[in-house]
Amino acid sequence: MRVGCCLLLKPIRQRLCTASISSRHIMRWCATSSSNINSTETAAKMPDDDVSGSLSAPSLLKYKIEPSTATMGAPRPPHDDDRAFCTLASFPPSHIRNFAVVAHVDHGKTTLSDAILRRTGVLSGSQVGTYTDRLLVERERGITIKAQTCSIFVVRDGEEFLLNLIDTPGHVDFQYEVSRSLSASDAALLLVDAAQGIEAQTMAHFHMALDRGLTILPVLTKMDAVLSDAPVDRALQDLEDSTGLLRREVLFTSAKEQVGIEALLHAIIERVPPPTGLLGLSDLQQLPPLLPGSAERAAMEEKMVPLRALLFDSWTSECGGGLRRPAPRGGEKVNSGNDNDSNLICLVRIIDGTLTAKTVVTFYQSQRRCEALEVGIIHPELRPTAALTAGMVGYVVFSRVRGEEFFVGETLYTLPTRKFAREDIVPVPGFRRVQPVVFAGFYPDEGEYITQLREAVEKLRVNEPAVTMEPLDCPALGSGLQLGFLGMLHMQVFQERLLAEFGQRVLVTPPLVQYKYREAGSDEEEPLKPLTVHTWKWIHEGAACYLEPYVTATIITRREHFQAIDSEALRRFRGEQLDMRVLDDARVLVRYKMPLADLARGFFAVVKSLSHGYASLDYGDPVYEEADLVKVDVLVQKSRISALSVICPRSEAPSIGKRIVSSLKSNLTRTAVDIPLQAMVGSKIVARETVKAYRKDVTAKIHAGDISRKQKKWNDQKKGKERMARRTVGAVTLDQSILAAAMGAISL
């Protein structure tokens, strides 16, 4: 649940991290990057007045990290030895750490994740770019869209630890990715840009982790970018005031300079709690022939814990974002038999038990049974292993499973053993499906078939579980699909992935939010009915009232930009200011009550433009309120074009209708007859334009004589055009380019 307005709550004064760590280990900023996590040497402590090192600003030396006295050795097994992974033994839960990296947009999550992977030897120094951004659209846009995980092996004081890192998106449209990642984690690294401080999504992620009872490790990032102590002090104060996290708990890092990474890894091992799972032999159906009541039999029964795992992501080889099994070395040809593009790859967190290849697992909701073809970890590509045990995060490969037979958030389990019955299997709690807030029609490009588009969408939905799909049929555009998304950016990214990964060019109708209505004579307790342009009901047709979704939008911006943003919110986007709070000398927090339709229409883009990119926005779940809504229909030569119908407030119907018919007039080709363009609300015309016909000068050869000769020619021409118009009713063809231009006018 989005909780951007939670900044107004009183500070939560409590110690969120149960494990303690030396304050001098946390609060001292080290301006050197000389030590490496694979080295047994630690960096020497720098004096407070020393200004040497890779960071140029001497004022940063107020915040230093003194390296831990614990030492870290080389990771094992080596990341380039495939045989070591195939024989990977189970890790005890006490030596496993699962954590997610969460933060506001562009606060350094992916850069820090890559720095951790490079410091631990998972990535080599020769590899460039952000490794966890695998999708083409992620690299083009420069943002994280899909959460990515990677297993890291670290040896500390002779003990080997398995760290499972999950890098998450920061944009509000991808909160579902963050929610799933936190459900599979035991802790969250809460990153805050040292220069920008607390932002709206920072608080949303903080409360999301807090609601799940996760340990929170606050981390200030981009320490190399600040030029004085003032922004760091302000960020620390914001953390204390807004979250209750103590200053001495804060870690300082510079992923760009590879500084503070080793101290961060030490803190993860010391402060992140190990998973609480039971090891077991999940696929064991019969006990060995041991004497009843013997200690050996009792010990074996204790190990017979059935498998219980959380499925928190899935993909196929066709839409896996470049995640593949590493190529064999030395020209070896390896064929595991599990490389079929139609196979389903699921990312799972093992709660209890053990998962091995050939284990038959059951999906809790659908009761579908499937055999695991392969299990393994991501390090950083797919690495098959002998087993996944309690507390581990890895992948499992199934033969092709249809999308309706499972959903992300599903609990996987094995058949009951002698000790555990079916009713003892409890689904993994704390995970819920989200409802889409923006809907749009997707139609295949001219010359393409709906079957190919439907297959591409179904394959991509395996990796995008928040997208909903329903069939559509439009006389002007043909067969299509109505898809539901979590926001405008989510819709744009999905459209780009269809083109990049499946080559599908589509025409997208204007996005609409989910309106609802209450039937006449129904009780207040009865559920509301969904309202779309295809299921529209007027009041005289049985609708008692219409309801529109409203959200509470929280904006954090600089004080000099507040007036411009406030003016636009109230004037163009039907916003109602709820409250405003001054955070510090430079920033303010303001909350608006606003229709979700106006928010999706481009409010965030306007806020970013007016604030020069320095504002952040978050909004919560929609709440439905009664509204005066109408449906605007567009008629071209008296034929209704359903693709251009739109639901809007009654007060905005004339302006929206005017924009649509004006766009059609400027793009339609003139013909031999007039083409009337009308926008109607019910039976009332609210806007009209006419595409004038070509007119032949029938009096060109008449140079003299009475005027009645010209009038006769004009009357004959008029009668002929009337006969032609009667024969060509509905014959106007609208190309997709014309419809796309008219649809764009709706969103202005």
From Swiss-Prot:
Gene Ontology molecular-function annotations: GTP binding; GTPase activity; mitochondrial ribosome binding
Residue range of the transit peptide in the UniProt record, numbered on this chain: 1-29
Listed GO biological process terms: positive regulation of translation; translation
Any single Gene Ontology cellular-component annotation: mitochondrial inner membrane
Keyword Cytoplasm on entry: no
Record-stated family: Belongs to the TRAFAC class translation factor GTPase superfamily. Classic translation factor GTPase family. LepA subfamily.
Record's protein name: Translation factor GUF1 homolog 1, mitochondrial
UniProt source species: Trypanosoma cruzi (strain CL Brener)
Lineage: Eukaryota, Discoba, Euglenozoa, Kinetoplastea, Metakinetoplastina
